[in-house]
Protein backbone atom coordinates (compact mmCIF):
# COMPACT_ATOMS: atom_id res chain seq x y z
CA UNK A 1 0.00 0.00 0.00
CA UNK A 2 1.38 3.41 -0.99
CA UNK A 3 0.29 6.81 0.26
CA UNK A 4 -0.07 9.79 -2.06
CA UNK A 5 -0.92 13.41 -1.45
CA UNK A 6 -3.75 14.88 -3.50
CA UNK A 7 -5.38 18.29 -3.59
CA UNK A 8 -8.63 18.85 -1.70
CA UNK A 9 -10.80 19.28 -4.78
CA UNK A 10 -9.56 15.99 -6.25
CA UNK A 11 -10.15 14.22 -2.93
CA UNK A 12 -13.71 15.60 -2.80
CA UNK A 13 -14.35 14.36 -6.34
CA UNK A 14 -13.04 10.87 -5.59
CA UNK A 15 -15.10 10.70 -2.38
CA UNK A 16 -18.23 11.80 -4.27
CA UNK A 17 -17.82 8.80 -6.59
CA UNK A 18 -18.42 6.32 -3.74
CA UNK A 19 -21.05 3.80 -4.81
CA UNK A 20 -21.37 1.57 -1.76
CA UNK A 21 -20.39 1.26 1.86
CA UNK A 22 -16.86 0.07 2.41
CA UNK A 23 -15.59 1.06 -1.02
CA UNK A 24 -11.96 2.14 -0.71
CA UNK A 25 -10.21 4.96 -2.54
CA UNK A 26 -8.34 2.29 -4.51
CA UNK A 27 -11.64 0.69 -5.56
CA UNK A 28 -13.02 4.04 -6.69
CA UNK A 29 -9.89 4.96 -8.63
CA UNK A 30 -9.75 1.55 -10.33
CA UNK A 31 -13.34 1.97 -11.45
CA UNK A 32 -12.68 5.50 -12.71
CA UNK A 33 -9.37 5.06 -14.53
CA UNK A 34 -8.93 1.42 -15.51
CA UNK A 35 -10.47 0.08 -18.72
CA UNK A 36 -13.35 -2.31 -18.22
CA UNK A 37 -11.43 -5.23 -19.68
CA UNK A 38 -8.57 -4.84 -17.19
CA UNK A 39 -8.40 -7.82 -14.88
CA UNK A 40 -8.50 -6.85 -11.23
CA UNK A 41 -8.21 -9.41 -8.48
CA UNK A 42 -11.43 -9.16 -6.51
CA UNK A 43 -13.51 -11.63 -4.62
CA UNK A 44 -17.24 -11.19 -4.68
CA UNK A 45 -19.15 -12.85 -1.89
CA UNK A 46 -22.57 -14.06 -2.90
CA UNK A 47 -25.40 -12.95 -0.68
CA UNK A 48 -27.63 -15.77 0.47
CA UNK A 49 -31.03 -15.47 -1.09
CA UNK A 50 -33.70 -14.47 1.35
CA UNK A 51 -37.35 -13.70 1.08
CA UNK A 52 -37.89 -10.16 -0.11
CA UNK A 53 -38.90 -7.82 2.66
CA UNK A 54 -41.65 -5.34 1.97
CA UNK A 55 -41.30 -1.76 3.12
CA UNK A 56 -43.88 -0.68 5.67
CA UNK A 57 -45.89 2.40 4.73
CA UNK A 58 -45.02 5.13 2.26
CA UNK A 59 -41.78 6.74 3.33
CA UNK A 60 -42.13 9.41 0.64
CA UNK A 61 -45.30 10.75 2.22
CA UNK A 62 -43.35 11.29 5.45
CA UNK A 63 -40.16 12.75 3.98
CA UNK A 64 -40.59 15.65 1.57
CA UNK A 65 -38.18 18.07 -0.03
CA UNK A 66 -39.94 20.97 1.70
CA UNK A 67 -39.64 19.32 5.10
CA UNK A 68 -35.97 18.49 4.59
CA UNK A 69 -35.23 22.06 3.47
CA UNK A 70 -36.05 23.09 7.05
CA UNK A 71 -32.83 21.34 8.08
CA UNK A 72 -29.91 23.50 6.91
CA UNK A 73 -27.22 21.04 8.03
CA UNK A 74 -26.71 17.82 6.09
CA UNK A 75 -26.21 15.84 9.28
CA UNK A 76 -29.67 16.96 10.45
CA UNK A 77 -31.24 15.81 7.17
CA UNK A 78 -29.37 12.51 7.43
CA UNK A 79 -30.66 11.94 10.96
CA UNK A 80 -34.22 12.94 9.96
CA UNK A 81 -34.37 10.40 7.13
CA UNK A 82 -32.92 7.66 9.33
CA UNK A 83 -35.37 8.57 12.11
CA UNK A 84 -38.37 8.26 9.78
CA UNK A 85 -37.11 4.92 8.46
CA UNK A 86 -36.53 3.65 12.01
CA UNK A 87 -40.01 4.70 13.15
CA UNK A 88 -41.62 3.05 10.11
CA UNK A 89 -39.72 -0.24 10.37
CA UNK A 90 -39.40 -0.84 14.10
CA UNK A 91 -37.58 -4.09 14.90
CA UNK A 92 -36.60 -4.60 11.25
CA UNK A 93 -34.37 -1.51 11.59
CA UNK A 94 -31.98 -3.74 13.60
CA UNK A 95 -30.71 -4.93 10.22
CA UNK A 96 -28.79 -1.65 9.78
CA UNK A 97 -26.40 -3.00 12.40
CA UNK A 98 -25.06 -5.34 9.71
CA UNK A 99 -23.87 -2.39 7.59
CA UNK A 100 -20.20 -1.74 8.09
CA UNK A 101 -17.13 -0.83 6.12
CA UNK A 102 -13.89 -2.70 6.00
CA UNK A 103 -12.67 -1.02 9.18
CA UNK A 104 -15.71 1.02 10.15
CA UNK A 105 -18.85 0.56 12.17
CA UNK A 106 -21.61 2.85 10.90
CA UNK A 107 -24.51 1.94 13.20
CA UNK A 108 -24.74 0.75 16.79
CA UNK A 109 -27.17 0.43 19.68
CA UNK A 110 -25.10 2.77 21.84
CA UNK A 111 -22.68 5.66 21.50
CA UNK A 112 -19.83 3.79 23.19
CA UNK A 113 -19.71 1.10 20.50
CA UNK A 114 -19.11 3.73 17.82
CA UNK A 115 -16.54 5.54 19.96
CA UNK A 116 -14.68 2.27 20.57
CA UNK A 117 -14.49 1.72 16.82
CA UNK A 118 -12.98 5.18 16.34
CA UNK A 119 -12.68 8.29 18.45
CA UNK A 120 -13.57 10.50 15.49
CA UNK A 121 -16.91 8.96 14.49
CA UNK A 122 -18.98 11.84 15.91
CA UNK A 123 -21.84 9.51 16.89
CA UNK A 124 -25.38 10.89 16.95
CA UNK A 125 -28.58 9.30 18.18
CA UNK A 126 -31.17 8.57 15.50
CA UNK A 127 -34.25 10.45 16.68
CA UNK A 128 -35.64 9.06 19.92
CA UNK A 129 -34.57 5.51 19.03
CA UNK A 130 -31.93 3.35 20.66
CA UNK A 131 -29.82 3.51 17.47
CA UNK A 132 -26.71 5.60 16.93
CA UNK A 133 -24.95 6.43 13.68
CA UNK A 134 -21.47 7.61 12.72
CA UNK A 135 -21.80 11.11 11.23
CA UNK A 136 -18.28 12.19 10.30
CA UNK A 137 -18.71 11.03 6.70
CA UNK A 138 -18.99 13.36 3.72
CA UNK A 139 -22.32 14.00 2.01
CA UNK A 140 -21.72 11.40 -0.70
CA UNK A 141 -21.01 8.71 1.90
CA UNK A 142 -24.13 9.68 3.87
CA UNK A 143 -26.19 9.39 0.66
CA UNK A 144 -24.63 5.98 0.04
CA UNK A 145 -25.52 4.92 3.59
CA UNK A 146 -29.13 6.00 3.05
CA UNK A 147 -29.29 3.80 -0.06
CA UNK A 148 -27.77 0.87 1.85
CA UNK A 149 -30.22 1.32 4.73
CA UNK A 150 -33.13 1.40 2.27
CA UNK A 151 -31.86 -1.80 0.66
CA UNK A 152 -31.62 -3.74 3.92
CA UNK A 153 -35.12 -2.54 4.82
CA UNK A 154 -36.50 -3.99 1.58
CA UNK A 155 -36.76 -0.94 -0.67
CA UNK A 156 -35.86 -1.37 -4.32
CA UNK A 157 -32.82 0.40 -5.78
CA UNK A 158 -34.95 3.13 -7.35
CA UNK A 159 -36.56 4.03 -4.02
CA UNK A 160 -33.17 3.98 -2.30
CA UNK A 161 -31.90 6.38 -4.95
CA UNK A 162 -34.97 8.62 -4.43
CA UNK A 163 -34.30 8.76 -0.69
CA UNK A 164 -30.66 9.64 -1.28
CA UNK A 165 -31.72 12.34 -3.77
CA UNK A 166 -34.12 13.81 -1.20
CA UNK A 167 -31.22 13.95 1.24
CA UNK A 168 -28.70 15.51 -1.17
CA UNK A 169 -30.35 16.62 -4.43
CA UNK A 170 -27.14 18.30 -5.58
CA UNK A 171 -25.48 14.88 -5.90
CA UNK A 172 -28.16 13.65 -8.31
CA UNK A 173 -28.73 16.65 -10.58
CA UNK A 174 -27.94 16.05 -14.23
UniProtKB/Swiss-Prot annotation:
Can you provide one Gene Ontology molecular function annotated for this UniProt record?
DNA binding
Family per record: Belongs to the SeqA family.
- Record GO biological process: negative regulation of DNA-templated DNA replication initiation; regulation of DNA-templated transcription
Entry's Gene Ontology cellular component terms: cytoplasm
Q: What is this protein called?
A: Negative modulator of initiation of replication
Q: What is the lineage of its organism?
A: Bacteria, Pseudomonadati, Pseudomonadota, Gammaproteobacteria, Alteromonadales
* Compartments (UniProt record): Cytoplasm
What is its biological role?
Answer: Negative regulator of replication initiation, which contributes to regulation of DNA replication and ensures that replication initiation occurs exactly once per chromosome per cell cycle. Binds to pairs of hemimethylated GATC sequences in the oriC region, thus preventing assembly of replication proteins and re-initiation at newly replicated origins. Repression is relieved when the region becomes fully methylated.
Tell me what gene encodes this.
seqA
